[in-house]
């Protein structure tokens, strides 16, 4: 994960001070890309411990089309609590857009099922895309999508994915995002009998919050360790049938966790 630390340093060295929606203040750069070869290890940050339980359960929650935090709470995941209303609802966030994008004619489009069918039946298509950025529903969402648009690409029997993230909290959010989409690529590759290729991350407003500077310098002082390996223990009938216990990370030996406040 050397490229992640290099991004942190780049934001420190080249970032512009900007105000933001949360009132916290950031150092920000615009436009950055990282590429992770998923055959060389699972891209889970090692310079601090990442909460893998939250990453896995959040992705499974997205894939079910869920937008209420009840499932997350049942599994001791609290990462969405700050944005939920008193009933645990978040509005039409990621899960709704992935699984039930509302069309003008009243249909609801399941983008994940569409993508799975494309990967199996038309893998050379240049339209294997999922978007969470539904302009007509942004004002109903508790939080507008940060990781907003992703595309799959098949070549030489390998499945790759590129994500466009319009807003990126480099210290807290980005390690989750990288691991989550890497996990999704592994799951989709298994379902389609493909090998994994690359995960390409592209960031728009890529920033460090002003109250994460001490933590960032601490993390930069640490030496990255070997990447772990993801093991998927079974092949379910569909992309929607995975369970938390299907996943195991082997050889994850991170430095201790580093706490930091969330900008809401």
Swiss-Prot record:
Binding positions ((6R)-5,10-methylene-5,6,7,8-tetrahydrofolate) = 51, 169, 263
Query: What GO molecular function terms would the record report?
Result: thymidylate synthase activity
> Any idea which UniProt keywords this protein has?
Cytoplasm, Methyltransferase, Nucleotide biosynthesis, Transferase
Its pathway is: Pyrimidine metabolism; dTTP biosynthesis
Q: Which InterPro entries does the annotation name?
A: Thymidate_synth/dCMP_Mease, Thymidate_synth/dCMP_Mease_dom, Thymidate_synth/dCMP_Mease_sf, Thymidylate_synthase, Thymidylate_synthase_AS
| Catalytic activity field | dUMP + (6R)-5,10-methylene-5,6,7,8-tetrahydrofolate = 7,8-dihydrofolate + dTMP
- Which family does the entry's similarity section mention? Belongs to the thymidylate synthase family. Bacterial-type ThyA subfamily.
What does UniProt list as catalytic? 146
What EC number(s) is this enzyme filed under? 2.1.1.45
Q: How does it assemble?
A: Homodimer.
* Gene (name only): thyA
Annotated GO biological processes are:
dTMP biosynthetic process; dTTP biosynthetic process; methylation
Function comment? Catalyzes the reductive methylation of 2'-deoxyuridine-5'-monophosphate (dUMP) to 2'-deoxythymidine-5'-monophosphate (dTMP) while utilizing 5,10-methylenetetrahydrofolate (mTHF) as the methyl donor and reductant in the reaction, yielding dihydrofolate (DHF) as a by-product. This enzymatic reaction provides an intracellular de novo source of dTMP, an essential precursor for DNA biosynthesis.
**HAMAP family documented for this protein:** Thymidy_synth_bact
* Location in or out of the cell: Cytoplasm
Matching PANTHER family, A to Z? THYMIDYLATE SYNTHASE, THYMIDYLATE SYNTHASE 1
Q: What is this protein called?
A: Thymidylate synthase
Cellular component GO terms held in the UniProt record: cytosol
The transmembrane residues are none
Q: Where does dUMP bind?
A: 21, 126-127, 166-169, 177, 207-209
